[in-house]
Amino acid sequence: MSFKKYLSIALTLLVVLATFAGCAAPAAAPAAAPAAEEAAPTEAAPAEAAPAEGGETIKIGVTMLFDDRWLTSMREAMQAYGEGQEGVEVIFVDSKEDVAVQLGQVENFITQGVNAIVVVPANTDATDPMTQAAVDAGIPLVYVNRKPANLPEGIAYVGSDSIDAGIFQMEWIAEKLGGKGNVVIMNGNLSQEAAQQRTAGVKQVAANFPEIAITKEQTANWSRDEGLALMENWLSTGDPIDAVAANNDEMAIGAIQAIEAAGKLGQIIVGGVDASADALAEMDAGRLNVTVFQNAVGQGEGGIATAIALARGEPVEQIVWIPYELVTP
């Protein structure tokens, strides 16, 4: 694959994030603006609660899933960024992808008196109770990576515009298919905005090609093992499959393993999202055809930088987009 291109992407985004460190607030939204139908990002109102006084440690509580390879990379970036900031302590708890557990963790952070809370939501359609709890307590709240269905004024979000991942992925697949073929979609967790919007992006592009059919669609819950099992099931039907559009790399790798076991490696195009280390290795080996880079470091650092700025009472952009980039061999 073109490592120069990939490194250029990463370095560009890290330069953007360097602005966070310099001014203690997130960088301006990149050129890839939100869709026209969305209102332009507004400034998140500073928290009513007084920020940590001079000399006091700013404590940031983070609740997110631990058992996920990509999110682990993002968590490590959050931790490293926090450790690099003087007078900042970042506390992590495992949400276990459970809505009730996560709400309890947010409530515990409030009781502990943290200065800001960062959430990677277990369910993007069920964030209102967490939002209300933080607002009632006057504690700044930042959602990261998974954009809530409802993002009220004063609550910040740092992440990527999920529909773009599906669009970039499917545009490349459609071109390689010559505008015709049977495509299957592996969904992530459908209670989460990322899976919903990445899938919407794939379908949006496919709709422009009358001879491309979405023949199968099912969740594999972001899991390599579930992706393997689902692909085995699809292959066992004998139905023609020309391409797999997976919502993330882990499911794509599982699909590749099933395709290889069936003796069909090289006969079916496989696409993922994240550009994880494992995915790039699969691409170098000629097994993964396309992925879309999602910057774990950029999102992680941006989320903590935004939380720090809000804890200090500084204005920030309500939405900070960290753009996706296509990655091909």
Question: What do the predicted segments below correspond to?
Answer:
Residues 18-22:
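C-terminal motif of bacterial Sec signal peptides marking the signal peptidase cleavage site
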